[in-house]
Amino acid sequence: MKKTYIILLVSLLALPTLAEENEKKTGITFEKYNFQSADLKEQKEDIDMENGVLGIADDRGFTLQSRDGKFIFKPYLFMQARGQYNYYDDEGLDKAYNQDNVANTGFSMPYAILGFTGTTFGRLDYNLSINAAATGGNVLQQGWIDYKISPAARFRAGKFKTPFFHAYLTTLGETLFPCLPTSLTASVILPYSLNAVTPSIGTGFDLGFQFHGKLKLTPKRENSWMMGYEVGLWNGSGSGVNTATKTLSDDAHIPSLLYAGRLTFMPWGNMPATQGNSHMLSGKHMLFGLSGGINVESESESTNDTRIGVEWSMLYGRWYAATEAYWMHVSFTERQKIDKSYNFWGCYGQLGYFFTKNLQAGFRYDFLDRNGSGKDGFLNMPAAVVNYYVNKCNLKLSAMYQFTGRYGHANQLDRDNDDLGLSTHSATLQLQYSF
C-alpha cells in the first residue's frame, strides 16, 4: 500500500514536467484564460464575439491553442435560470368563466448550453452549441463552419443567426434585457382562422448559407470607417426544424426559401455584438444598419413575408443606446384564395448605463402594430432592468419589469384582441453563468 501511495505522489509531481515536455513537442499551450486575459480583467475595447454565445477573447474559461495561433479550441458552458411572474388581463371575459389572471409563472431555464468553438488552419472558424434545456430541433442551438478568404470575404454554412435585427444579433447573454423586445417575438394577428399562419417580425436562428465580411473604408485612419455585409439563403422554417422541408414556389417558381441580407456602417471601427459589457467601459463604437428579406411560401406554404428594418446602436464609455424600426408585409399565396395583404410595424428604443463596474441599469420602450396598419391601435411596452455583474465568478444577475399597454383602438373588442396571449404585467429575475 505504501508503494502505491509513493507511485501516485511521484506521478502527480511529474505532471508539470510532462506537460512542459508535451508543449515543446506539440506546440500546444493550455491556458486558464484566453488572449490578453490580464488586460481583460480590467478593460478591453473590443472582444471577438463571432460565435454568438461567448466571446472568444474574454477571460471566461480557458483555451487550447497552438503557438502560431492557427489552431484554437475553446469549450464553453452557458446557463440561464429564471423566475417569472406574468399577470394577464381578463380580455373582456366575465368573471363567471373563472379564468386565471396569473399564468406562465414559476421557474424556467431557457438556456443550458455546452459548446465548442475555435479556429483551424488560421482560416476556418467553427462553433457547435447544444442547448440541453430545449426540445426537438432547438436542442441544436447552432452549429456552423466559417471559411475566411480575407476579413472582407467569408463563407458560413450551417445553423446560425439570420442577418436581421440588432436585438437578435447581439451575443447571447450580452443583451441589456433578459427578454427580447415583444415587437420582435409576438405573433401578429390576422383576421383569418389559419392556425398555421402565425408569423412574427423576428426571424432568429435558421439553417442556411451566408456570404459576409467587413471592409475598412478609410484604412489609413486609426479608427477607420468600416462597412459590414451579410447576404444569404436560409430554409425560413425557424430554429426548430433541422431538416430540408422546402419546395419550389408555385407562384414565383423559385425555391421557397428565406432570402435575406444586411448592410452596416461603423464610423468608429468594429462594433462588438454587445449591449453592455463590464470589461468594455471605455472606448466608443457606433453602427448604422439596413436589413431586409423575403420568406417565400412561409407559414406552411401559405404566405410570402417581406421584412425591412433599420437600426442604430452605440457604445460610448459606460453608455449604451440603440433603436430599431421594422416593417413586415404579409401576402397570401394563390392557393389560399385571399387577395388582401397586410402590413405590420414595430420599433423600440433602449438606453443603458454602468453606474459602477458591476452595476448596469436600463430602460426600453417598445411599440408593436400587432393587428395591422389597416386597423387603429397599437401596443406600447415600457420596461426597466437592473443588471449586476459578479466578474470574479462570471455571474450576471438581472431583474426586469415590463408593462403592456394598449392605445388608440377603435373599440373595446379590438383592444382586448390586440394583446391576446401577452401578459399585462411581467417580472423576471434571472441568474446567468458562463465559463
Please place each PLM-identified region on the residue numbering.
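C-terminal beta-signal and adjacent terminal beta-strands/loops
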Residues: 390-396, 402-417
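Detector for outer-membrane/organellar transmembrane beta-barrel domains
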Residues: 262-371, 380, 388
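N-terminal periplasmic/intermembrane-space "pro-region" immediately following the signal or transit peptide
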Residues: 17-78, 221-225, 435
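Outer membrane beta-barrel
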Residues: 61-239, 255-271, 277, 347-362, ...
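Sec-dependent N-terminal signal peptides
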Residues: 4-13
